[in-house]
Regions:
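Active-site C-terminal subdomain of aminotransferase-like
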Residues: 21-22, 201-285
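Conserved beta-loop-alpha segment that forms the PLP phosphate-binding cup at the N-terminus of a helix
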Residues: 60-89, 93, 97-102
Length: 286
């Protein structure tokens, strides 16, 4: 019996919400020999890629990168910002919001789910009421998935931010942008997001395996008192490294790909990229 794999018949097109199809130029950018991650050539690639991701996030805050899927960035956000027994609110929007909540429970956090119909999305008034009732400020963080891959539900992050502000509550605001970044308008600094969870395999057009968190100054201050156990994802350790984003070996080929993907976004124009996704999404719905 032959063990030879059959040759693909034409170009493989992946009709899936993610991972997504990877542009040829991104694949070609990654097709190169390995390089020392301290080599000046790679440091320039790294810096260009990070600056490009900040542009897409619309932020000036610090980014931490991981050799991990989005689940790794989820875990990094929780363990670097919170302590055992901390109470958090998770806004239900579908499978992945529930999985993030389950991960938080696994780390010993007190998770309160703001329940919602997966077809209609969160009731912002319910969040406002929950925070208003929390006079002791026991809630340490609010977690939301910007775009729920499983249901296609998009949450109004700006409205959620306004609801938190209206109550004067000091809770951190954590947002998962894994399936929205580079496809939907997202403004980390303007919307005062304390921790953004992102991944490369969707709007950033990379293979799976790279994720990251963007962290505000308020988030970094909370990190200094967070007591959940961590090591590989520890931001304090990362900040001591030359590239200030990794523990262990950097995935150099992925950064070459990321440099090309953010170049493609800048070439088309971020607003044009978002408008294109908006048109295609509406065409799909109709």
């Amino acid at each position: 019996m032959s063990t030879t794999l059959p040759k693909p018949r034409g170009r493989h097109f992946f009709a899936n919400p993610g991972p997504t199809n990877i542009p040829d130029s991104v694949l070609r950018a990654m097709d190169r020999p390995s390089i020392d991650f301290n080599d000046p050539e790679f440091v320039e690639v790294y810096n260009t890629a990070v600056t490009g991701v900040k542009h897409v996030l619309q932020t000036k805050q610090h980014l931490f990168f991981y050799n991990a899927s989005g689940h790794g960035a989820w875990e990094a956000s929780l363990t670097n910002l919170l302590s055992p027994g901390d109470r958090i609110l998770v806004l239900e929007s579908g499978y992945f919001s529930d999985e993030w909540a389950n991960m938080a429970r696994g780390h010993g956090l007190d998770v309160h789910l703001i329940e919602a119909d997966w077809r209609r999305g969160v009731d912002v008034a319910a969040l406002r009421a929950a925070l208003t009732a929390d006079r002791a400020h026991d809630v340490k963080a609010v977690c939301a998935v910007h775009n729920e891959t499983a249901t296609g539900m998009m949450l109004p992050i700006d409205e959620i931010r306004a609801a938190i502000d209206a109550t004067g509550h000091p809770a951190l605001f954590l947002v998962d942008t894994i399936s929205s970044l580079g496809s939907l308008d997202f403004r980390m600094d303007e919307w005062k997001i304390d921790c953004v969870v992102g991944g490369g395999q969707k709007g950033l057009m990379l293979p799976t395996g790279m994720s990251f968190t963007g962290v505000s100054e308020k988030g970094l201050a909370a990190h200094n008192t967070a007591k959940l156990k961590r090591f590989y994802f520890d931001w304090s350790l990362m900040m001591q490294r030359p590239h200030k984003s990794f523990i262990g070996t950097l995935p150099t080929s992925m950064f070459y790909g990321l440099q090309e993907s953010v170049r493609l976004i800048q070439e088309e124009g971020l607003s044009n990229v978002i408008d294109r996704h908006t048109r295609l999404a509406e065409a799909t719905r109709r």
